[in-house]
Amino acid sequence: MIFGSGTMLSFGYTLLTGVIINLLAGVWMSRYMLNSVIRYKLFNQEKWFRKKKDKKILKFAEAKKYFFLTSVALLLTGTIWSCVNGMKLDTQFTGGVILRYTYTGKADTGQIQKEVEDIVDRSVSVQTSENSATGEKSLVITLSGKKGLTPEQQKEILNTINQGNKNQFETSETSAVEPYIGAKALKNSVIAIVLSFLFIVVYIRLRFSALGGLASGVTAVIALVHDILIVLFIFGIFRIPVNDAFVAVTLTIIGYSINDTIVLYDRIREHRSNMKKKSTLAELVDISTTETLQRSINTAFTVVLCAFIIFVVSVVYRMESITNFSLPLLVGLISGCYSSICIAGPLWVWWEEHREKIQKRKTGQKRK
């Protein structure tokens, strides 16, 4: 919120409000309603509550090599793809000109793109959308770069697309984004994400000092970076312009993913204090992950289902801006669930085991 403006500032306020309301509903309202229900004899029976069943302990820590290799392969593939094809930055971050038109009939976006590129002598992006409520059709032409458009060029573009497509286009809005404004927006977005990582490390280090503090914080952030890179590569592979939607998706994924990771760490801390030295680190993670697995999957499935419905509706009704948001969000949610289950815990085990080996070496050297 400090570094945001416009839609990002609105998203920040909405996200903060949702977190506060969710906290009140989850901590107070749900407890109040449950206590109210169990006062009745009909509901105060064992059959209404699921018994805790003995579960087979899954060996997540033993399979960490396979999880790490899978993630490395995905990230390496995405990196190579991005290096070869490049990322598509939106005008919001690069600067440029945005032309908006309303029209009737049909618009050939491929033909319009070629005609406009011939006029301005640079690459352009052409998108169409339709308001499902009013039926109004819109055409958006985006020109990235430092060069602006003269009034003569704007008039020529309007005349050309009207002649070539036999439609009645009318100029709705013309806006220019200065390059320094785009660079500032990109810088602020990066700062906001980096600061969120730092606060997460500090918070987890203080809350989970029993788990090594810094180790748990760093491994949690590594899992988050994994998710953000996956989302970034989705933007690149599907040629989605990187704009404030990327920042919104990133912050949303960070929230959901770190929540699952904290639940896992909390269970590890609980078992570690109860079992003391009876279990190894790998066994602690296996038991804790198995116990929180169903909760993580159920939560992720609910959110993924909502994101999938939004994605399908946006594709059917050709709401491109919503599609460009919901598709990366959908993949990011799946990645967040995977990283919190298969990356965060096993990575913490690897870190702690490696640290213990170093300490033993130092102790052995001192004795000599």
Region roles according to the model:
Residues 1-368:
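A structural signal for conserved, well-ordered secondary-structure elements
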